[in-house]
Curated annotation (Swiss-Prot):
Signal peptide: none annotated. This is Uncharacterized protein 52.2. Disruption phenotype: Mutations in the gene confer resistance to acridine-inhibition of phage development. It comes from the Viruses. The gene is ac. Coiled coil: none annotated.
Length: 51
């Protein structure tokens, strides 16, 4: 596994962790936070995986 794919996986895992923490801490803002973080993580993961 090369560096780019590794970073993509790490960013994806961080997004999942962030979503879980957001749900536990502040459920009222979970949708807006998950959407913003999810888009960034998903785009990063897809772009880096295309190497």
């Amino acid at each position: 596994m090369n560096i780019a794919k590794l970073l993509g996986v790490i960013s994806f895992i961080c997004w999942i962790v962030a979503c879980v923490l957001t749900i536990c801490i502040d459920a009222s803002s979970v949708f807006s936070q998950a959407l913003a973080q999810g888009m960034c993580a998903y785009l990063t993961f897809v772009l880096l995986s295309n190497d």
